[in-house]
């Protein structure tokens, strides 16, 4: 069993994206659902659905433009051994605004841009570009 469920989610998406797969299945949790929702809102994935009764899984439908991947890269920033926290004014921009930072705040999980606008700092979970 993996100890870092967010890293596992990002790795599954990265591997499926590299193989140009249409969908990827991920064990479900509230945090993963929020991250999937952010990826959908920002246009990195087409859609996601939750399936199953007892053991719920998230099925993410990856997005491609012809033969080009929409997700160029995913990087886990805060790790179990080294947590990375940033105040609102120090949340990094990803590729000068072309990517997103996913931040866990006291108000929930949101993009770096939303956190800066709300003036809320938090734990920088990942970068997606």
Curated annotation (Swiss-Prot):
InterPro entries: Ribosomal_uS8 (IPR000630), Ribosomal_uS8_CS (IPR047863), Ribosomal_uS8_sf (IPR035987). One of its GO terms (cellular component) is ribosome. Pfam families: Ribosomal_S8. GO terms for biological process: translation. Keywords: Ribonucleoprotein, Ribosomal protein, RNA-binding, rRNA-binding. The keyword Ribosomal protein applies. Belongs to the universal ribosomal protein uS8 family. One of the primary rRNA binding proteins, it binds directly to 16S rRNA central domain where it helps coordinate assembly of the platform of the 30S subunit. This is Small ribosomal subunit protein uS8.
């Amino acid at each position: 069993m993996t100890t870092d469920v967010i890293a596992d989610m990002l790795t599954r998406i990265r591997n499926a994206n590299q193989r140009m797969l249409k969908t990827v299945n991920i064990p479900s949790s509230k945090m993963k659902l929020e991250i999937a929702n952010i990826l959908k809102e920002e246009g990195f994935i087409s859609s996601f659905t939750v399936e199953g009764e007892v053991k719920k899984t998230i099925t993410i439908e990856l997005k491609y433009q012809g033969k080009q991947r929409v997700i160029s890269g995913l990087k886990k920033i805060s790790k179990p051994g080294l947590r990375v926290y940033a105040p609102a004014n120090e949340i990094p921009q990803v590729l000068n605004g072309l990517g997103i930072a996913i931040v866990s705040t006291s108000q929930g999980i949101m993009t770096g841009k939303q956190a800066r606008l709300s003036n809320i700092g938090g734990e920088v979970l990942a970068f997606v570009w």
